[in-house]
Amino acid sequence: MDENDHDESRVALVSGGSRGIGAAVTTALTQRGCRVGCTYRTGRDDAEKIAADAPEQVLPIRFDLHDDTTAPTAVADLVSHWGHLDSLILNAGQWSGGRLVETDADAWWSVIETNLRGTVALARAALPHLVHGRSPSIVLVSSVVGVIGHAGDTAYAGAKSAMIGFGRSLAKEVARDGIRVNVLAPGFVTTDMTDAVPDSARRRIERETVLGRFGTVDEIAKAAVFLSEDATFCTGSVLTVDGGWAL
């Protein structure tokens, strides 16, 4: 199928789309009538469960953040299946905390590479297809800690801050191609990742958050869909959705 032979449905690719925020984004997009490539690395069963709920709209695709050679294949699989690509939501990532002086150097750099390498590789692979998309857009899911920093998160915050700089710079590069690039910076959200947060730290975060609670994946997904589908006059923006934690 030629990429100019678009049908009515928009096509999105969501990295890390089988769990947590990514799964909520995948579901929210299908509810909008989009068809979605939902990438996974180890969560194939999770991706297939999402696809079972919307078999005509969800395509599970394997993509390994640690191996950027899998990015072109992931994009090619989606375009081969549905003919074009309109939006890319770069959500896949990994958290690992710890004070800098107490963190092994290899482990520290692994967090940086895991969060950045696959993101950049997937964006690079998708751009030649996005230029043919309708109202094409890229959303990078960063973090509020990448905006203001957070003690004990130098690697994760460093990677997420780099995503913001990457996204804003890419927005300037591809604007002439009609591609919007925006960054979503969630605060603390209830996911498998934050289940590991100790109760004492959770209570402190809730006290620091103006709205007094962790966010939900559905709340973050709504913001991601807004940036991807509705924010047609936004590019290079950073949308913080953190319940007021950063105030």
Please provide the spans of the model-predicted regions:
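Active-site helix of classical SDR
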Residues: 123, 159, 167
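Substrate-binding pocket helix/loop in short-chain dehydrogenase/reductase
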Residues: 99-100, 107-112, 194, 205
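Short, small/polar-rich loop/turn modules that mediate ligand/substrate recognition or access, typified
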Residues: 135, 175, 180, 234-236
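Residue(s) in the substrate-gating loop at a strand-loop-helix junction
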Residues: 143
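Alpha-helical segment proximal to the catalytic Tyr-Lys
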Residues: 128, 172-176
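Conserved glycine-rich Rossmann-like NAD(P)H-binding loop of the short-chain dehydrogenase/reductase
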Residues: 32-48
